[in-house]
């Protein structure tokens, strides 16, 4: 079997090919393969690993363009996923600066993590003597987010981060913000929510790749949505993002039951929408947009049932 590893020596990028017999690796994990290559073929190969138990998150890499936790990925699973392939390309995590081979720079991510104040500020009712406890129901609200091991797989898969990192944070940072804000022991959830809003909470593009590739099956996309709801309930409801969310709700409940894209632009950007006239003309020519829908489209079948479902969801959230 052929393993093409993307390498970096501090000056140039290059790829190196290693060959291993299938029978020698089929009982190993991906990390086991990397260790075998380092021990038997190339001691200069650099990668990070520690616990080998899917706890520390240090060994995440990409295989054929997708993120995997190396110690938690069996080679038999990769054989099954990439059937009829005898070649695997192993690369460092995407959306990170590469330091050496499969080793990436975590400092920018840690700086973003600091922004959301990643430590619990407990309510005054707790003390060092009595402890800082919560019941099982309260813990269950955040138990999934506690599973995050900061492996960076979500960052590597994030399409928004690939496009522009200047106005966004790593998905796991928002997961940590939600865990802290939703903790029943927290003195002030907003000390975590406000910096999340200020650093791109509304810029998620909803591709859900962070969720799809998380080795711990955490939905960072859902955590982002929950942070948005909390932010709006606390009065942080101005700007393009909240206006977009409100427009969706208005069209679903008060409108026809489907998004009116012409009105959406006007609600969000107002007169600034004029700058998108060229795009609007292109869409109309392609039959993708009907200008008459600005007056409202036809109501979808079953709209009353949709409204009932939304009302029921709201009621359940309040309980």
From Swiss-Prot:
Q: What Pfam families does this protein's entry cite?
A: Fer2_3, Fer4_8
Q: Which organism is it from?
A: Wolinella succinogenes (strain ATCC 29543 / DSM 1740 / CCUG 13145 / JCM 31913 / LMG 7466 / NCTC 11488 / FDC 602W)
Q: Which InterPro entries match?
A: 2Fe-2S_ferredoxin-like_sf, 2Fe2S_fd_BS, 4Fe4S_Fe-S-bd, Beta-grasp_dom_sf, Helical_ferredxn, SDH/FR_iron-sulfur_subunit, SDH/FRD_Iron-Sulfur, Succ_DH/fum_Rdtase_Fe-S
* Keywords, alphabetical: 2Fe-2S, 4Fe-4S, Cell membrane, Electron transport, Iron, Iron-sulfur, Membrane, Metal-binding, Oxidoreductase, Periplasm, Transport
UniProt GO MF annotations: 2 iron, 2 sulfur cluster binding; 4 iron, 4 sulfur cluster binding; electron transfer activity; metal ion binding; oxidoreductase activity
Q: What is its EC number?
A: 1.3.5.-
Q: Which reaction does it catalyse?
A: 8-methylmenaquinone-6 + succinate = 8-methylmenaquinol-6 + fumarate
* Residues annotated for [4Fe-4S] cluster binding in this entry: 148, 151, 154, 158, 204, 207, 210, 214
Which stretches make up the 4Fe-4S ferredoxin-type domain? Answer: 139-168, 193-224
Query: So what family is this one in?
Result: Belongs to the succinate dehydrogenase/fumarate reductase iron-sulfur protein family.
Main localisation, per the record? periplasm
Cofactor(s) annotated in UniProt: [2Fe-2S] cluster; [4Fe-4S] cluster
Q: What's in the GO CC field?
A: periplasmic space; plasma membrane
The protein's name in its UniProt record = 8-methylmenaquinol:fumarate reductase iron-sulfur subunit
């Amino acid at each position: 079997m052929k393993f093409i590893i993307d390498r970096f020596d501090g000056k140039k990028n290059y790829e190196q090919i290693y060959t291993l017999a299938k029978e020698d690796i089929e009982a190993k994990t991906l990390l086991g393969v990397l260790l075998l290559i380092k021990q038997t073929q190339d001691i200069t190969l650099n990668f990070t690993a520690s616990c080998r138990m899917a706890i520390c998150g240090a060994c995440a890499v990409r295989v054929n363009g997708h993120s995997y936790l190396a110690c938690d990925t069996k080679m038999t699973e990769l054989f099954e996923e990439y059937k009829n392939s005898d070649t695997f390309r192993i690369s460092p995590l995407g959306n990170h600066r590469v330091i050496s081979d499969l080793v990436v720079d975590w400092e920018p991510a840690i700086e973003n993590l600091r922004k959301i104040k990643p430590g619990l500020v407990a309510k005054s009712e707790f003390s060092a003597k009595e402890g800082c406890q919560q019941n099982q129901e309260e813990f269950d609200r955040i138990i999934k987010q506690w599973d995050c091991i900061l492996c960076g797989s979500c960052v590597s898969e994030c399409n928004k981060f690939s496009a522009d990192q200047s106005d966004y944070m790593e998905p796991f940072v928002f997961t940590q913000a939600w865990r802290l804000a939703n903790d029943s022991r927290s003195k002030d959830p907003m000390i975590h929510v406000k910096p999340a809003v200020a650093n791109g909470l509304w810029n998620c593009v909803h591709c859900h790749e962070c969720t799809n590739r998380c080795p711990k099956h955490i939905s960072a996309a859902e955590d982002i949505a929950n942070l948005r709801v909390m932010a709006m309930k606390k009065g942080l409801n101005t700007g393009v993002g909240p206006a977009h969310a409100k427009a969706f709700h208005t069209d679903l409940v008060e409108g026809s039951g489907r998004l009116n894209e012409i009105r959406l632009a006007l609600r969000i950007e107002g007169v600034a929408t004029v700058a998108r006239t060229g795009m609007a003309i292109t869409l109309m020519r392609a039959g993708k947009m009907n200008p008459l829908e600005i007056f409202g489209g036809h109501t979808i079948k079953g709209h009353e049932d949709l409204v009932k479902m939304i009302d029921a969801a709201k009621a359940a959230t309040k309980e």
